[in-house]
Amino acid sequence: MLGWELPPHNSGGLGVACFQMAKALAQNGAEIDFVLPYKASHPEADAFMNVLSATDAPPMVDDQGNYIAMGAYSGNCPLCGSRHCKHARAYTKGLTAATHRYADQIESMVRGGTTTPKIIHAHDWLTMEAGIRAKEATGAPLIVHVHATEFDRAGGHSGNPLIHDIEYFGMQAADRIFAVSQITKDIIVRRYGIPAGKVEVVHNSIDPSELSHTTSQTDTSYHYLHQMKTRGYKIVTGICRLTVQKGLSYLIEAATLALSRNPKLIFVIGGSGEQRNQLVELAADLGISDRVIFTGFVRGARFRELYEVSDMFVMPSISEPFGLTALEAAYYDTAVLLSKTSGVGEVLHNVMRFDYWDTRKLADQIVGISLSPALQSTLVEGIKQEYLRCNWGDVARKMMHQYSRVIANHRRLSKVSRVKEVVNRG
């Protein structure tokens, strides 16, 4: 399995999804070598799979200590050599150079290995070249797992043509493609010209053991928010990377409209990203900076506590292939509001939906929930029944079935190819 990050050295949901997915696969009998482009300790992952390093480079972090997953979430991520990175010299210059280096190391590893993998599973565009070269070196079938396309990361714009090309060739070379939602599958078929029959929708899920409730509000990092809730305020939260793809400027504009009708609202935005300063300035320009809190990147207990204190969770993404945080929010009895371009809406139906650009409708929904305890309760109870049906075990069993089909088909085609060679020689 080829991936670009794993917790605790992750900067977003890709690493979380890969970790939980691999854990469930291991519980269903898969033996996994997970190869990363950096060298670091992963004690939790080591408990159920073999985590390998393709290079001796450490994980990259910015000046605030946040991890940088070069290009995993944005075509404009900081590159090696960026002034924001403490360990820039550990990587070759340029994002494509980093992916080439990773691919070189993967090819060397599989050629020098004592065993041949039964299947190669590559996560997103950064590992696709490595997946192709590993397939060529070993003859093993390749599965490409698309968590997001460049069209998603560009937030409705065309994005980086080089990344489009890498994604296209990776999906062409794949024996099977996993897409995290029907929305993503439709993009793969429509924008990349891939046959629909080659793409399997595999929704993400959640692991409740990773989302245990905190035991006491006295230890929380959010005393202020708890105090404001006792005064009748509602907490509206968005947790994501602060990038154009996530549509947070629309949420802040909707917040202005909502606050004009119900001043007892506090908006909390958790996450880090290149749009942070722009969003802070937008809140100030709109005169609501006293009602919008930016927490920075959150993980662990602070991450869980933020969900717990929230009344509403909003995902205003312009293009969201899945949206794992919405499932997590549902676990914490939070009313969920989703843009219509969020893939998690294929799993969660007891939610409020809106077009990402329709700030007036989003404001209406926020105000409606904030003023109606009955509506909030109905949404929370309805969504609870849906997330209780979600589990990584079912996802893993579906993937194991697909693995078996791909391996069997690969063997059949290899046998046919050998027979043809014999016939041609004769």
Model-flagged regions — what are they?
Residues 24, 30-114:
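A conserved catalytic-core segment of Leloir-type glycosyltransferases
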Residues 183, 205:
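Carbohydrate-associated surface elements
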Residues 212-229:
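A short helix/loop element that forms part of the nucleotide-sugar donor recognition site in Leloir-type
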Residues 229-246, 252-255:
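Conserved donor-binding/catalytic core segment of Leloir-type glycosyltransferases
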Residues 297-298, 305-310:
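Short alpha-helical donor nucleotide-sugar binding micro-motif in glycosyltransferases
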Residues 318:
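Aromatic "clamp/platform" in nucleotide-sugar-dependent glycosyltransferases that forms part
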Residues 335-338:
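Short hydrophobic beta-strand element within catalytic cores of glycosyltransferases
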Residues 351-360, 368-373:
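Conserved acidic donor-binding segment of nucleotide-sugar-dependent glycosyltransferases
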